[in-house]
Swiss-Prot record:
Pathway assignment: Carbohydrate biosynthesis; dTDP-L-rhamnose biosynthesis; Bacterial outer membrane biogenesis; LPS O-antigen biosynthesis
InterPro entries from the UniProt entry: G1P_thy_trans_s, NTP_transferase_dom, Nucleotide-diphossugar_trans
Keyword set, alphabetical order: Lipopolysaccharide biosynthesis, Magnesium, Metal-binding, Nucleotidyltransferase, Transferase
Gene3D superfamilies, per database record: Spore Coat Polysaccharide Biosynthesis Protein SpsA, Chain A (3.90.550.10)
A GO BP entry: dTDP-rhamnose biosynthetic process
Needed co-factor(s): Mg(2+)
The name this protein goes by in its record: Glucose-1-phosphate thymidylyltransferase
Length: 292
């Protein structure tokens, strides 16, 4: 089976969140008890992906390196690349060409939070897909804000539109994408859209026209949270807090995921918990490995 590498796109200027993001990356803001980037990172980890490239702005990349390091503490290999200007999501594959090499890849947006009991199982088919692409569709109330996918009666994708004024369905394409290696050349040959960006929707449309696009449904029981506004930041934090306080279990905790997937051992978790031992996060890690 081919290796699949992951990319987290954590760039952008975050202007919709000004003044909050005037001096700090949006993806470093807290979502309840963790930095935002822990959530997309955890999504890739749950898919079994351990080689991950983080793409961010020139000013924010050193901050991500300070927070995450080389990933070895979680049994990962993290690398970093700079996106000088936000020229579209598909630019990630051009920036990451050397990192991707001859492997398949997955892209997750740094401000997207995914939650659901069967999320690893849902991603498994995409991870194991030998060729083509897989995107994930989610029913939303305001599809005009997103890339929208339209289905025929058999559930096959027949159209993709980016932020349409008159959406043909209520199904948005989420910020999680799995591609085979041909995505790199597609991105390099892509023409900028009317707004001057290399659109991920255009990549997905090429796969669709080739008959190589799979659409997996994130149905009821899944949460897909977009954290692009002040209100959605609060809502995401409240959502995570409600689940964690009710269950006594963490959502998107990289240390726990790494431990449960055997990326790291119990002793390594205990060492990671040391500097955090005075707060609930560190206590949770210690309790988890001791099985109390």
């Amino acid at each position: 089976m081919k290796t699949r590498k992951g990319i987290i796109l954590a760039g952008g200027s975050g202007t919709r969140l000004y003044p909050v993001t005037m001096a700090v990356s949006k993806q470093l803001l807290p979502i309840y008890d963790k930095p935002m980037i822990y959530y997309p990172l955890s999504t890739l980890m749950l898919a079994g992906i351990r080689d991950i490239l983080i793409i961010s702005t020139p000013q924010d990349t050193p901050r991500f390196q300070q927070l995450l390091g080389d990933g070895s503490q979680w049994g990962l290999n993290l690398q970093y690349k700079v996106q000088p200007s936000p020229d579209g999501l598909a630019q990630a594959f051009i920036i990451g060409e050397e990192f991707i090499g001859h492997d398949d890849c997955a892209l997750v947006l740094g401000d997207n939070i995914f939650y659901g009991h069967d999320l690893p199982k849902l991603m498994e088919a995409a991870v194991n897909k030998e060729s083509g692409a897989t995107v994930f569709a989610y029913h939303v109330n305001d599809p005009e804000r997103y890339g929208v996918v339209e289905f025929d009666q058999k559930g096959t994708a027949v159209s993709l539109e980016e932020k349409p004024l008159q959406p043909k369905s209520n199904y948005a394409v989420t910020g999680l994408y799995f591609y085979d290696n041909s995505v790199v050349e597609m991105a390099k040959n892509l023409k900028p859209s009317a707004r001057g960006e290399l659109e991920i929707t255009d990549i997905n449309r090429i796969y669709m026209e080739q008959g190589r696009l799979s659409v997996a449904m994130m149905g009821r029981g899944y949460a897909w949270l977009d954290t692009g506004t002040h209100q959605s930041l609060i809502e995401a934090s409240n959502f995570i807090a409600t689940i964690e306080e009710r269950q006594g279990l963490k959502v998107s905790c990289p240390e726990e995921i790494a431990f449960r997937k055997n990326f790291i051992n119990a002793q390594q978790v205990i060492e990671l918990a040391g500097p955090l031992s005075k707060n609930d996060y560190g206590k949770y890690l210690l309790k988890m490995v001791k099985g109390l």
